[in-house]
From Swiss-Prot:
Main location class: membrane
Protein name: UDP-N-acetylglucosamine--N-acetylmuramyl-(pentapeptide) pyrophosphoryl-undecaprenol N-acetylglucosamine transferase
Record gene name: murG
Membrane topology label: Peripheral membrane protein
EC number: 2.4.1.227
Pathway entry: Cell wall biogenesis; peptidoglycan biosynthesis
Role of this protein: Cell wall formation. Catalyzes the transfer of a GlcNAc subunit on undecaprenyl-pyrophosphoryl-MurNAc-pentapeptide (lipid intermediate I) to form undecaprenyl-pyrophosphoryl-MurNAc-(pentapeptide)GlcNAc (lipid intermediate II).
Length: 379
């Protein structure tokens, strides 16, 4: 840490969920290694995700999510965003950052608006295949846009967009070194189920119901790790106990990358961070996009991996316990297919995304344009 602040300060702004904070954490790790003093601006939800940042480098900015059309609620929301703008200006006057990078979520609006109005270079990173609402609102103001799954060379902001991939945290890169080893037909079958950093109620009900429909000899092979919301944890655990299936059920796993590396098969939502980690580590998956995502971003993320042959995608509405049981039984008895899926997933992973994004961040901080960056990085 001795070289911190040799280069100056960069502030990362991210909404307080794992999907926004994990790529911010990955970029922070890379920038620190290059001598930057990295601070995080976020909201109050972020507490359990920010262990990678020193406490005095985490700044809670007042914010609110724009939802609905109630005039009173909208007035309160815009008042909170205005207060966040004042918070951000005060913070930036003290830190004097050379760059502010946004990772999506409404809590990024105040810091990015404040930075652009103060003449501080700005960059946003969009993790998904479809740009989220906060980033859409910022895209016209920022100096550069980095994309995880955004379509290349298309859209209104193609000229200032660079496809970097989604940065993954160091533990993911460590897990990626573990090769995929398929389970033999009589071996224990390690199943990992998770719904992103906030869990998934649907999985807590559907997976135990599907496991109950499996033949007894198939159930006896299962070892399950399942992330469940706190309110669903006890019922999911009890369901597996009743079935006699060993299951580790918890609201959050700090060692999720290692658990993914240990898995023979993954059933998950298809948020950008989830899909990116699956591809970097290289594991076969069934993806069930969250059906109520505002911009259908999860469906687009899942389609990108399915097109490469790295995952099966199933709509939640089509996934009855019976169908889920059939698909799980098929996965358990087709190790060669899962091995091919794992290879296909890994082939589209971008383990160097943090390095590429850090290169872009340093270029924008130094005053370069996106065009100059692209020309300097052509092979």
């Amino acid at each position: 840490m001795d070289n911190l602040a040799n280069q100056g300060v960069i502030v990362l702004a991210a909404g307080g969920t794992g999907g926004h904070l994990f790529p911010a954490e990955a970029l922070a790790h890379e920038l620190r290694a290059r001598g930057w003093d990295v601070h995080l601006a976020t909201d109050a939800r972020a507490q359990r995700f920010v262990g990678a940042f020193a406490q005095d480098h985490v700044h809670v900015i007042r914010s609110a999510t724009i939802a609905g059309r109630n005039p009173v609620a909208l007035l309160k929301t815009f008042w909170s965003l205005w207060q966040g703008n004042l918070d951000s200006r005060k913070l930036f006057r003290r830190l004097k950052p050379k760059l502010v990078v946004g990772f999506g979520g409404y809590p990024t609006l105040p810091p990015l608006y404040a930075a652009s109005n103060m003449g501080i270079p700005t960059l946003i990173h969009e993790q998904n295949a479809v740009m989220g609402r906060a980033n859409k609102g910022l895209a016209g103001r920022v100096k550069a846009i980095a994309g995880g799954f955004l379509p290349e060379n298309s859209g209104a902001y193609a000229a200032k967009t660079v496809i970097t991939g989604n940065p993954v945290r160091p533990p993911v890169l460590v897990a990626a070194a573990t090769p995929y080893t398929p389970a033999g037909k009589d071996d224990r079958f390690r199943l990992l189920v998770f719904g992103g950093s906030q869990g998934a109620q649907f999985f807590s009900q559907a997976i135990p119901a599907a496991v109950a429909l499996l033949p007894e000899h198939e159930r006896a092979r299962l070892l399950i790790t399942q992330q469940a919301r706190k309110e669903d944890e006890a019922s999911a655990r009890k369901a597996y106990e009743k079935l006699g299936v060993p299951a580790d059920v918890a609201p959050f796993f700090n060692d999720m990358p290692a658990r993914m590396a240990d898995a023979h098969f993954v059933i998950a939502r298809s948020g950008a961070s989830t899909v990116s980690e699956i591809t970097v580590i290289g594991r076969p998956a069934m993806l069930v996009p969250f059906p109520h995502a505002l911009d259908h971003d999860q469906a687009a993320n899942a389609a990108a991996l399915a097109a490469a042959g790295g995952a099966e995608v199933v709509r939640q509405a089509d996934l009855s316990p019976q169908r889920l049981a059939e698909m799980l039984q098929s996965a358990m008895n087709e190790p060669e297919r899962l091995e091919q899926q794992a290879k296909a997933a890994k082939s589209v992973g971008k383990p160097d995304a943090a390095r590429l994004l850090a290169d872009l961040a340093e270029a924008i901080a130094s005053g370069k344009t996106v065009q100059e960056f692209k020309e300097g990085n052509r092979p």
